[in-house]
Amino acid sequence: MSEQATWTHPAAQQQSSNIAGDGIFASEDLPAGTIVARLHGRIVDDVTLRGLLADAAAEGGYVDTIMIDDDQNLVLAPDQLIHFCNHGCDPSLWHLDATTICTRRAVAANDELTIDYATQTTHADFEMTCNCGSELCRGTVSGVDWMDPDWQARYEDHVVPAVRRAIQRWGTA
């Protein structure tokens, strides 16, 4: 994939969020299954990603990335609207495939569009405090949430391929 911009649905708009900073909100009703984003960026391996993350941390910056496959991470181009997509433990978005994100259910105008960050990584060192406020809030989001059978049932195949394979391997261990 090239360093081209990520496409986002025209109804996705940046606004102030109660979850964290700014978020992405629907400016109109979106039916379930509506494609909201097609991610583009630069694919890097895990070693390169760790270097990018360390450099960004040292400079007070941020690297927007998702794990799309084993040892393949998509680093999104800077200044993309999708950067403002906050985590939610009962999200309105999920993956159709590694780089396509759609609505998980019908979304009303003015609702925040969120995605479960744990559907995008198996990196065991990933962990963050959650502020989503949903009834399903886990309090902490991590790169090992995929090990929870209830979590697996909720998302089924709507995760990146690396998470899907980790679940399959774990289930046969």
Give residue ranges: language-model regions:
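Catalytic cores of histone-lysine modification enzymes
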Residues: 2-93
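C-terminal SET catalytic tail plus cysteine-rich post-SET Zn-binding segment of SAM-dependent SET-domain
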Residues: 89-173
